[in-house]
Amino acid sequence: GYASGDSVAFFEGGEGIEPWKRMQRAAIRTPLKVEHLLASSALPFIFPAKKINREYFGDGSMRQLAPMSPAVHLGAERIFVVGVGRMNEHDVRRRGDIYPSLAQVAGHALASIFLDQLMIDIEQLQRVNDILGRVPPSVMEHLGLPLRQIETLVISPSERLDDIAARHVDALPIGVRTLLGGIGGTKRAGGGLASYLLFEKPYTRALIDLGYRDAMTRADDIVTFLGLKTVAAVP
């Protein structure tokens, strides 16, 4: 919320699930409506904030320090994460000899807001799982620690989304292109910023195609994780 500064998770669930409150994040039980969806997708400076009860809310990724926390609090035993970050690039470093443009800096800042926390949270969950796997359940029960292992499957793009965005900058309205061009946003290094502004069909179609290919590459993992018998390929 813009007034409180808290990351609020609105949820529906069984009566046994109690709302929670942590540092800078909280949960509120309420019937989910269209305004909650609009608020959760209200990108700053692009889509208008939505007022829910006493304050205005923006994109759900802002100040979301623990993105998987709501699923954990709601009792999830398995979490299927479809990310848009760079989980596959731990050992890949790009050379940068050219001073970063304003667009590149802005894209970097936006990534720190919308992408990085999810990857950090995934690593944290995996570390907790590893620790719990080394501690006998009887010890955890004796200590009274309400911790449990949570199975995760993480799928992330095999191609950088900012590279794809850089190839489709021409699909943006001319006014937006002109603005981006003045700060280096129409060059490859500015693709990160462009990816947050692109909602045109050529770009979204490319994302859908990439997502389909990556999902089919991991089809066996997905089938096993979801407990399915098989997955049908769509031409």
Question: Where are the regions a protein language model picked out?
Answer:
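Patatin-like phospholipase
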Residues: 1-235
